[in-house]
Amino acid sequence: MAAKEVKFGNEARIKMLEGVNILADAVKVTLGPKGRNVVLDKSFGAPTITKDGVSVAREIELEDKFQNMGAQMVKEVASKANDAAGDGTTTATVLAQAIVNEGLKAVAAGMNPMDLKRGIDKAVIAAVAELQVLSQPCADNNAIAQVGTISANSDEKVGRLIAEAMDKVGRDGVITVEDGQGLDDELAVVEGMQFDRGYLSPYFVNKPETGAVELDDPFILLVDKKVSNIREMLPVLEGVAKAGKPLLIVAEDVEGEALATLVVNTMRGIVKVAAVKAPGFGDRRKAMLQDIAMLTGGTVISEEVGMELEKATLEDLGRAKRIVITKENTTIIDGVGDAALIESRVAQIRQQIEETSSDYDREKLQERVAKLAGGVAVIKVGAATEVEMKEKKARVDDALHATRAAVEEGVVAGGGVALVRVAAKLAGLRGDNEDQNVGIKVALRAMEAPLRQIVINAGEEASVIANAVKNGEGNFGYNAYTEQYGDMLAMGILDPTKVTRSALQFASSIAGLMITTECMITELPKKDTPAMPDMGGMGGMGMM
């Protein structure tokens, strides 16, 4: 076991605080409408420019092990806020820094750290309850657009695009962010179910001008295995040919003789066929095939349930109004599935979303719900250069998370005003002893930090504006973008309640633990032992 270095008391806390301040100072320059950018060097490719707090935090690794421990703990605050609400990472970091700095001053003055932490916790619990009281529902598209605009660094176009996307695919719909082709941002809405599998052979293409396969009123054959023998499919193909309808085959794979025969039949015009691979892998593929079956009113031909492809009939096939297949995607429009069955399938998947602990699984399940329930909106981000594209995409992503959080728990006045009002309402809160009272004051004082930092980043005097806001009432605050005082809600400066709540809870949780630290242990750096010297020629060993 490697030797360790141990630091105690004030010496340990000072080192930890230095690390906290280095990371927080780098992150907090990005806060507010006039926050600055941070440039991150990458080991390959161009540097990344970002205004996203968690992206800055993740890049920081300090050489001094004790400082690094402090920095890593604050990094955890930003990461947790990002995971919970998808935004508010910079606010959480600023709050954590303020609580740690004020708290450690109180510890140095002789307060009991455990009582300080209890006081901080008490203040935060009361503050969260007060935030819920101040919260207003995010009712209309205008409010959604305003939340998106604020989170995207006052970019109104992004706010409007997100509101439009939510309007089209519903509050639960999937909205994805992709690289655009031009300079302008665009919104594309995919109606029906789309999955990322294209045609298996370019010979299926019947619209050469668009390079796509379009099938009107087709049958859909769903097979949960590889198909390589055409004889298995002959009964189905004959039935489809008699009906005079096109056919889409969705299978694990279609290869060899089977694919060749389908291509020949299509080219000769005997039967209009297209084949695609089933989306997903393993169990997820089975589930997605079932989703398509529900949507189209078909049955998955699976040997697991004793069904054979040779015995499949037209009754087992799904139907849809139209299918469009490109090189990369397949879109099924207007499946004829039973609406009640689709609804119960959606409810079943939503239940799985509640139960899963994996973020990846949750995301995939939500995509399945959207595909069954309402379609998918794609925001295509336009920019002049790749560096700008990355920065803008990160902002749009943040704005998207913020609007979802706003729809979920409502909104409060933005610009740090909500926390200032909460702190004012809790001025009379008391703990069980004097040290807890100091802890409460530490937390309440820290709640002013986001407002102060927004003002500092706007180049104004923080104390003057903070006092003016504190003397106001309700939603009265300072708009750093226009440099005017007024009603924050009327000016469209809103923060999602969930974002503000999460930032405060995670910041106080980690900061409280740091205040109660008395000892820090880290590995000593390994000393490089000098290499053994060359032995050289040994005397008396000359060649005979």
Swiss-Prot record:
Positions with a binding annotation for ATP: T30, L31, G32, P33, K51, D87, G88, T89, T90, T91, G415, D495
Broad class of where this protein is predominantly found: cytoplasm
Assigned EC number: 5.6.1.7
GO biological process: protein refolding
Enzyme class: isomerase
CDD domains in the record: GroEL (cd03344)
InterPro entries the record matches: Chaperonin_Cpn60_CS, Cpn60/GroEL, Cpn60/GroEL/TCP-1, GroEL-like_apical_dom_sf, GROEL-like_equatorial_sf, TCP-1-like_intermed_sf
MF terms (GO), sorted A to Z: ATP binding; ATP-dependent protein folding chaperone; isomerase activity; unfolded protein binding
Alphabetized UniProt keyword annotations: ATP-binding, Chaperone, Cytoplasm, Isomerase, Nucleotide-binding
Domain of life per record: Bacteria
Subunit structure: Forms a cylinder of 14 subunits composed of two heptameric rings stacked back-to-back. Interacts with the co-chaperonin GroES.
Function, in words: Together with its co-chaperonin GroES, plays an essential role in assisting protein folding. The GroEL-GroES system forms a nano-cage that allows encapsulation of the non-native substrate proteins and provides a physical environment optimized to promote and accelerate protein folding.
UniProt protein name: Chaperonin GroEL
Organism per entry: Aeromonas salmonicida (strain A449)
